Design a protein with these regions (language model features):
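Non-cytosolic membrane-interface motifs at loop->transmembrane helix junctions
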Residues: 266-277, 337-343
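Membrane-interfacial, low-structure loops and terminal tails that flank and connect transmembrane helices
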Residues: 139-155
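Histidine/acidic residue-rich metal-binding segments in metalloenzymes
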Residues: 297-303
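Hydrophobic cores of alpha-helical transmembrane segments in multi-pass integral membrane proteins
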Residues: 1-16, 22-95, 105-137, 156-190, ...
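Short, membrane-exposed interhelical loops at transmembrane-helix boundaries
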Residues: 98-101, 335-337
């Protein structure tokens, strides 16, 4: 259904619905984008939760709680967009949600933030529970693969444990930022002045992290499952540990490439954002892509629908990642910002 909403938007842009109000496009855009990201995240979390049962014991009760909370959040999101024409886009940049200008009613904005609050609470609890389950068997240093970095023998840590731990630690930081954003929106509704640039920075910090860790959790599943089809192990080693250790740091700063148009930002932040975006592509993407190619090369690969989709997913990640690195260049972004290049670079994911 969400994919069909994307098709509807392309038809609308082509002039297929000349009599339709423009507000419908933006309401559908909001539902499509948030719905897609949410679906990917929930799917990735459910997938790693299942695979982690081989090594740990995440709580089934927490998973059921998240199932119910996610459904409630989705219902509210559908109501405020298709029912209330709430149309700020997935980024809901301050102060747009507070000024419907007659396009959407206050109840739609309220429902939107209630939906975000419910989803944020549920997903944070889910994230913390998985980290708890990992911590019951692995110490933090072991789960992050630090023993591989120093050459110290220890408990063998599967890549799915390492990547999930890195992703969810960063995810907690993103959810904290989301809580702050929602709280500041509430404060502004009560008349308290807030800094627009701070609001935008927190919003993109949260959004960029959520989208990235969603992909990383998918990659973690590929690390775990693709070897079953290749007949070869894919173990954690020093290179893998170094790569994902770098991700833990760099991902916190790569979101700056969303803020290049904000001339009020200090120049050093813009430069640091470009450098971080470049460097992030190496550990997360290059190591995993070359690892996939090395695993498949000269192996007795069983090419089924599942293994083919795993492989194509990694290739699509690489294609979209190259386009993302190009767009994270300040001079290029100056021309490509707010063009079709932006959605084109992340749809291959």
């Amino acid at each position: 259904m969400l994919a069909l909403l994307g098709y509807f938007m392309r038809l609308y842009q082509s002039g297929a619905f000349p009599g339709m109000r423009a507000e419908w496009f933006y309401a559908v855009l909001t539902l499509h984008s948030l719905g897609m990201v949410g679906t990917w995240f929930v799917g990735s979390m459910a997938g790693v939760s299942y695979l982690l049962l081989r090594y740990t014991r995440p709580s089934l009760a927490v998973s059921k709680f998240n199932y119910g909370g996610t459904l409630l959040g989705i219902v509210l999101l559908i109501a405020c967009t298709l029912g209330g024409l709430f149309g700020t886009g997935w980024y809901f940049l301050y102060p747009l949600p507070l000024y419907g200008q007659g396009v959407w009613a206050p109840w739609a904005s309220f429902s939107f933030f209630v939906a975000l609050t419910i989803l944020g609470i549920c997903w944070t609890i889910w994230t913390l529970d998985i980290l708890r389950a990992i911590a019951q068997r692995y110490s933090l240093s072991a789960a992050l693969g630090w023993n591989y970095l120093i050459g110290k023998p220890g408990l063998q840590v599967p890549p799915v444990i390492l990547i999930t731990t890195v992703s969810l630690i960063v995810g907690v930081a993103g959810f904290v930022a989301a809580v702050i954003v929602i709280a500041l929106f509430g404060a502004r509704a009560l008349g308290v002045n807030v800094d627009p640039l701070l609001m935008k920075s927190l919003t993109f910090f949260f959004g960029h992290i959520l989208v990235n860790i969603t992909m990383y959790l998918g990659v973690a599943m590929v690390y775990e499952l693709l070897p079953l089809y290749a007949g070869r192990p894919w173990r954690t080693n020093r290179v893998v540990a170094m790569a994902w250790g770098a991700v833990l740091f760099l991902i916190l700063f790569a979101y700056f490439h969303h803020l290049y148009m904000d001339f009020a930002q200090p120049t050093w932040i813009q430069k640091f954002g470009q450098i971080s975006s470049y460097l992030l592509s190496v550990p997360a993407g290059v190591v995993s892509i070359f690892g996939t190619l090395a695993l498949v090369f000269a192996s007795k690969m069983r090419w089924t629908l599942a293994s083919t989709l795993f492989f194509l997913g990694i290739i699509g990640w690489g294609i979209g990642g190259i386009a993302a690195v190009i767009d994270s260049t300040v001079e290029v972004n100056f021309h490509y910002h707010n063009t079709q290049w932006v959605p084109a670079h992340f749809h291959p994911y």
